[in-house]
Regions:
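Beta-strand-rich binding/interaction modules
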Residues: 156-200
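Substrate-binding clefts and catalytic carboxylate motifs of secreted carbohydrate-active enzymes
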Residues: 3-169
Length: 200
């Protein structure tokens, strides 16, 4: 899919996770600073045809309606372009990280559609037209670590993914769930082993 899906759905896709996938993507909103450079003062908010000119269309491959719904469900309706752009970075990070983390079981590979756009766009990029990295860049980098810990929302389990970091014994894994104000809501620590080329 090229539209945004809830994180769990990337882990439970009926087709695609069992093979190399040559392109996947989702809306990927640029930073607010880049939006100020892109949109006219009249067109920056609310979302309108000017957004569509920069690929943020509610229908078609981009499917930005689902992106808006995920923001509203998780954080409430944004009241400004600045608030939308800030919330979108959280959603983009979660979505892109889940997209890559969901591939860890079968290890079949994934190419991102795409790294950058040829003009100011709100979709399918890891850095924007102005070379500003988006949340996607950092999420993909994190999800692709040679030795990585992740939460699998389909099984509600924490997994240690070891792509190529060698075998490690006696690692300490610490999990924290944070509130929106960054206070710790829950945490747990465990000692784990990780064999090379495994997801446990």
């Amino acid at each position: 899919p090229y539209r945004m899906l809830p994180a769990k759905e990337y882990f439970t896709l009926k087709t695609g996770n069992d093979k190399f996938h040559s392109e996947r993507g989702m809306p990927n909103v640029m930073t607010y600073e880049s939006m100020l450079r892109t949109f006219s003062p009249e067109g920056i908010w609310p979302q309108d045809n000017e957004w569509g000119m920069h690929d943020y269309t509610r229908e078609g491959a981009q499917g930005c309606t689902s992106f808006n719904e995920i923001i509203a469900k998780g954080y409430g309706e944004p009241q400004s372009a600045k608030e939308f752009a800030e919330l979108a970075q959280w959603v983009n990070y979660d979505g892109h990280r889940s997209l890559f983390e969901s591939r860890s079981q079968n290890r079949k590979g994934l190419l991102m559609w795409m790294s950058h756009s040829c003009w100011p766009s709100m979709v399918w990029q890891t850095y924007d037209y102005y070379f500003e990295p988006t949340a996607a860049y950092f999420a993909i980098k994190k999800a692709s670590e040679p030795l990585h810990i992740q939460w699998n929302p389909a099984t509600d389990e924490v997994e240690v993914v070891n792509y190529s970091a060698g075998t490690h014994k006696g690692l300490t894994a610490k999990v924290q769930v944070l509130n929106m104000d960054a206070s710790v809501a829950w945490e747990k620590e465990a000692t784990v082993d990780s064999n090379e080329d495994t997801t446990d």
